[in-house]
Amino acid sequence: MIDVELPNLMQVRAFIRVAELGSVSRATEVLFRAQSVVTRAIAELEARFAVPLFERHANGMRLTDYGECLLPRAQRVLAELDGVPSLLGTAQGEPLYLFQARRLQVFVKLCETRHMQTVARHFGLSQPAVSAALKVLEGGCGQPLFVRTSRGLQPTVASRDILFPIRRALNELRLLDSDLSAMQGTLRGVVHVGALPLGRSRILPDAILRFTAQHPQVRVVTNESPFDLLATELRVGDVDFVLGALRPHDYASDLVGEPLINEEMVVLARRGHPLLHTHLTLKGVHQARWVLPRAGSPARQLLDNCFAAAGLTAPWPVVESADLAVIRGLLVRSDMLAAVSAHQLAYEIASGELQRLPLALPGTARAIGLMQRSGCLQSPAAVALMACIRQVITEQA
């Protein structure tokens, strides 16, 4: 079941048109609705948010501070939905068949589960109600969105084309309440953080502790998926931002990185390792039993390049892993070596359980920072958590 009822999209649409045109009467001309219907939509939306969105004047409607706060994100919701017809190659115009939040949620969940009964249970609906919602969407789109097969519902190309903007629209819609709460002086809601290995061991926990102490009504959810999956979640708004090793500028034009700190990789070994107090060279450790990042990962490529610059072939790993618990367990129980960022195992290094070998790995420096979707409008809570991350990094530097 869904706990929080999203704002009514038709009411949000009416709010935007009245705000843009300055009066209910002018808005009715573009909404093709009776004045009483538009007036009621505004009143119900104000009741939903429990704040006045407009000041009523004899010559029209003027946004209150609350209305000004909500308008930018509300416009982003409609912009995402208004762009769907062009993705489908259909006639332009307002796609009113999309202006029902539960219908959009059903579509997204069907794309995820590909099973109508599962979606019905999730939303507390009957299966015929789910079928009816899908029928309305397919009628508006003018083409099938799913094909029924022995393996369940399979999304069509059209479904895949419109899924991202619909997910973004729903995520923007969810943030309207958070925007309003922030304006009233209290941060509420949920911040979804993509946590890559270089940021999640020390930087992110310290920042979350600081943030939740300051804003106890905000919940933080971390996502530890691989970067490519996090990038997709970032693009659709399911993740607010990603903390970790930044990718090159040419990785994707729609993602923006903010470097906060640079750090070279180090070679770690257990306490008392026989190589700790010897003069080491890359050639001398080339044949060691290595625990290395996975082949093809940015960290592994940097490490391979480091050895290549010294005229050596890439070291052959006994184990490939990015899991810190696995790496730690292997190192403390053997004479294996691991090449990682010091941030990743900072507590083990500080306690002396793991120790750095006196060996530099030139050319392996990586920028650690924040990555966001280009042009996104972050929630106030996400902005505050990113500020805490910047503070923590500044203090730890």
UniProtKB/Swiss-Prot annotation:
Q: Is Magnesium there in the keyword field?
A: no
Signal peptide feature range: none
List, alphabetically, the GO terms of the cellular component aspect: cytosol
Q: Which GO terms describe its molecular function?
A: DNA binding; DNA-binding transcription factor activity
| Biological process per Gene Ontology, one example term | catabolic process
Residues of the DNA-binding region: 24-43, 116-135
Q: Which domain of life is it from?
A: Bacteria
- The chain's coiled-coil residues are none
Give the family per the record: Belongs to the LysR transcriptional regulatory family.
Please report the name of this protein according to its UniProt entry.
HTH-type transcriptional regulator GalR
Organism encoding this protein: Pseudomonas putida (strain ATCC 47054 / DSM 6125 / CFBP 8728 / NCIMB 11950 / KT2440)
Q: Which gene encodes it?
A: galR
